Each structure stands twice: as C-alpha cells, then as structure tokens.
Amino acid sequence: MAVSEQTVARAASLRDELNLYNHHYYTLDAPLVSDAQYDSLLNELRAIEAEYPELRTPDSPTQRVGSAPLSKFPKVQHPVPMLSLGNAFNADDLAAWRRRAEQIIGTQPMSYTVEPKIDGLAVALTYINGVFSVGATRGNGEIGEDITANLRTIRDVPLRLQPIDGQALPERIEVRGEVYLPIESFNQLNERQAHAGEKVFANPRNAAAGSLRQLDSTITASRPLRFFAYAVGPFSGVELKSQAQTLDTLRTYGFSVNPDTRLFADFEAVIEYCHEWMSRRESLSYEVDGVVVKINDFAMQRELGVVGRDPRWAIAYKFPAREETTTLLNIVINVGRTGKLIPNAVLEPVSLGGTTVQHASLHNADYIISRDIRIGDRVVVKRAGDVIPYVIGPIVEARTGDERVWPAPTHCPTCGQPVEQIGDEVDIYCVNNTCPARLIRSIEHWVSRGAMDIVGMGERQASQFVEMGLIKSIPDIYRLTVDSFGGREGYGERRVANLLNAIEESKRRPLDRVITALGINGVGTVAAADLARYFRSLPALAQATIEQLTAIEGIGGSTAQSVVDFFNTPANQQLIAELLALGLKAEPSEVAELQSDRLAGKSFVITGTLPGISREAAQALIEAHGGKVGGSVSKKTDYLLAGEAAGSKLTKAQSLGVKVLSMDELHALLVDE
C-alpha cells in the first residue's frame, strides 16, 4: 500500500515532537506536556508505524521499548581504547598528580574540570550523521559488547542529536558516559524482585549492569536506567578544544550532563571541591564513588598522553568505601520497646567508611529469608553517612556448603513468650507487655534527651534497675527513693541525690516532651509539638478523634489512628493516670513572643547538620518569626533548611521544586530591608 505524503509528514512530525518532549522530561527535568498527552502522541506514532513499517526509523521513540531477544552479544572493537583512571585518596595524592603533569608540560597556567564519578557502567555511543548507530560496553577497554538495542530503551540516550544553531551535525562522533540506576529506582526494583521470588541486586551498580546485559531488551526497557555523558571518543565534523566545551556541546546535542561538574583555574579550589563532595554524596539521588579531575585543555591532554592504561591528564579522587564484603558469623535478636524483634548481624570485623564494623542491621526476618542470607555467608555490608551499617545480601557464588539457614524465631529470646506477626506487617513482635527487654527499651526512650531528659539514667542504668527489681513500669521511675538504693554498690549518697533530683525535675517537662516520651507510633518531636499546641493537655489529647487529629497540618491518617489506638488501650490509660498521680505536670510550653511576622504563613523542614546552631534552636528561630516547622517534605513545604549530610529530604525537596536554604540565606530572610 502506498504511503501518502500526509502520513509521511505526520510520522516525521510526531517523531520530532516526541523526541523534544523526551529531552525536556528526562534531560532538562522540565516536562512540556502531561503523561497522558505524551502517551496519546506515542500511540498515534505506533499505529502509523504498525501500518507502514517502512516509516519506522532508528531514532523513532517507539524503538525504546525493546526488541526480540538475542542469543549472545556481538563483540565491538573500540576505535580508541576506553581507558581506566589512576586513583588519588587525599589532597597529597592530587598534588602529586599535578606535579607529575607539570614535569611534562611545564608550569604553564592550567584549568581543571571536576566531575562526579558515577558508580555505574561505562558505555560508548556512536552517532553517524546525528543518528544513534551503535552502543557498546567498555569491556576490557579495547573490546566491548554490542548492547545497542538495550541502550535505545534508556530515555535520556538521544536517538538523534539536536543541531546547534543550524550547524551541521558531526559526521561521526562517539559519546562516552555512564549508565546508572537512581537509588530510589534501585530500591523499588529490589522490592519487586524480592516479591516475585527473584534475585535481588547487591547495589545500584550491579542492578544497572545486570539490566544492561539482558539478552531480552524488553527487560531492560522495564527498568528506569539513566545516562550521564562525560566524554567523547573519536569524532569528525566538529571542533572540540576542551573538556568544558565538550560537555557544553554534548548538553546542547541533547545529552544529560551532570550539573555538578565544575571548571576551576585554581588548583586549591579543585581540592576544596573534592572535599566538599565527601559530605555531599549522601544527599544525591544516585551513587558516586569519587570525583574525576581532568586537565581541561585537549592540547595539553595530547601532550601528556597515557601511561599504561591510565591517562596522565585525569585522575579519580576516590571516597572511602561504603560497601565491603565480610563473613556473617551469627544473627542475634534484639527486642525493641514496641516488642519488635530486630535481627542483627555479627560480622567478622571489616573497615568501612573509616571505621571498624562488627555489627550490622538485617532489618527483619522477612528480609533475611527473602534474600536467603545464611550464617557463614560472605555478605556485602553497606554504610552510608550516619546510617547504621546493614547487610545488603549474600555472595552466593562464594558458598562452601558449610553455611547454615537461619531459623526465624518463634518465641521471644528474652521472656520466652510466643511471638506474633501483626496484620500485614513483615516484622515479628513479642506481645508480652511485661517482657523485661521491652521495659528496658521503653525506659531508655522515656529518659532520653529528646524526651524527659533524665540525667544519670541511660541504657546501663535502665538494665540495672530492671534486673534489681526497682523498676517494673515507667511510673516506677517516679517511685524511686533514697531507700530504694540502700546499700547497693555504686550508688552512693551523692549519686542517688543527683539522680532523684533529675527525676523530680523531669516532672516539669512540657507537654510536647511528654508526648514524645510516650513513644506513640509515628509521633516524633515535630508531631508531638503540633499535638501539644492544639490540645494543650494529656486528657484533652486522650479524647481526640480522628477528625480532630487529621485537621492538624502535618498529622496524617496513619499517625492519627496511632494516637487514637494508643489512648484507647487500657494499659496506656492506666499509665497516664499513674504518671499524673505521681506529679507529672505535662503542661504546654509557654508560647514565645513573636519577634516578627517575616516568616508568617511559611512552612519549613529542617535537615542535616547546621553550622553553629542546633536544629531545635533553628526551629525556635523560625517560629519566633512566624514560620512553622514540619517533619516531612511535601508540595506544601515552602523552604527546606539544609545543612551538611542532608540526605533524602534534600533529594525530595529538589524533585518537588522546594526552595533549599542555608543558614546564611535564612538569616537574610530575617534582615530588615
């Protein structure tokens, strides 16, 4: 059947339009149309190409869905080897690298690019007259594998380059970069894999590599891989003189280029930026294992050349490892204050992130079983920032046959009572309210600094007092007297007096601290402050309805239900009655007089370590000027006040377009104009 000129023109128009929308959505993060509009146009193009296959072009957006499975990947010879990089681990190593370069090219002025080193899979993409032709893995640097069909499925790999100001596209250009899987996408993928009973991936890099090397490209298409371009290989028909110019050109062609790349003329600034990345890495939405420093000028790069397989003009500044392998020696169970049984790994000591790690989290029994983690396994352990180290999974290939399957507990290891799984939760609970382990954890929480702040009572004292029989419930803390400690070793007159004074002082803690101390599920310090401001007393809060609770900004349905359930439990009603009878005041904090209304109507969330000020003090400052501080980032959040190691809240704020402030910028908002 002959194809009309109108149909040919419509197919071409749809291709151009959809490629433009892809570029704005995936590369610029600035969608031009809704998902429904995009899908409608894509379906129209699919229908045309199904009826007229001759109109299906290599750069068509319909080609991103994957093609027929392959039996194996063909080999590809890289025309110019994909080199490895030498490593630097500190400022001295960076300075030594620079001196070696100066010995060859002299002490002439140099500029440097500094780029995040994405922890993914290096690939090379060849474009002929602007059209994506061949894509290959790095392989051994000289020979890789042809994974063109899989690379076509990645949304921010352009299938056709965008011309620059009417200039002709290069006749041939090889673009090099990194395929990676964002952390959130990695976690979602592993959840799906575990739910389906399939192998979970140890880390985002392995997931990206495994996804790219699928013989069936429809599997690759189902996984949200991303791509950052960072270099070119051989090229013709375009003039490129520096790394910075190359990145700008690639960005204009339609590639995603890491926005955190910087150009410096001062080498000290290079070192400072490398150090800055040591703290920033935790706030990223993707994994990095260092930064790459390159001498910017291509003429200098050619003069410096290569030694072995490493270019003299570039070096990788490597961060301390966040993942290591070690042996799982045992699995022990801790019991939390809610009765949750928490499995913990006992490990052969391993250095991780600058510290020696011997224990790590295993989350819950379902996590261990779904990943088939066995005692004696070689396991991958990860530590990120201040997060407790945790076991990612076993290295199955390293098994010897001596490993032991872990038996999930059926009874509490402390009190011996049968355990239960509540509702749809994956966690296992000890439901014995008199379990000593639960009581000890509850005491620790009650006396903690963010709650009742009883100086002289901590983890060790809580365990001792329970073992001595002095404390059998939280109210027993307020029944302690001098006679309770009579003759007990380590508790002299002065120490006992100080402890009893601290306990007496805690009776005057404000209502929000008492609510925090009660340990209601989902109620942290911010929610506790909101509840205290609204209800003004424990009896009033105890009578609150779901409707009243959810009317408070920041209190969601699940938290409201937790509050109602807590106060409807007879044991908790008795707890509160006893505490009030023992003299607990639980009165609301005095509302500080407003210093100004400059932040009135503005909502803030605070995250990270702030310079020179605690989060509590920052919250008080914001509230003193009429602002409100919440606990989680949402579309309603006006500002995120972020310090160092800001973490996932910063990532979410950036994705929602929430303005991020430093302390200096917050102070600027408060200055008189």
UniProtKB/Swiss-Prot annotation:
Disulfide bonds: none annotated. Its EC number is 6.5.1.2. Its cofactor is Mg(2+); Mn(2+). It catalyses: NAD(+) + (deoxyribonucleotide)n-3'-hydroxyl + 5'-phospho-(deoxyribonucleotide)m = (deoxyribonucleotide)n+m + AMP + beta-nicotinamide D-nucleotide. It comes from the Bacteria. DNA ligase that catalyzes the formation of phosphodiester linkages between 5'-phosphoryl and 3'-hydroxyl groups in double-stranded DNA using NAD as a coenzyme and as the energy source for the reaction. It is essential for DNA replication and repair of damaged DNA. Belongs to the NAD-dependent DNA ligase family. LigA subfamily. This is DNA ligase. It comes from Herpetosiphon aurantiacus (strain ATCC 23779 / DSM 785 / 114-95).
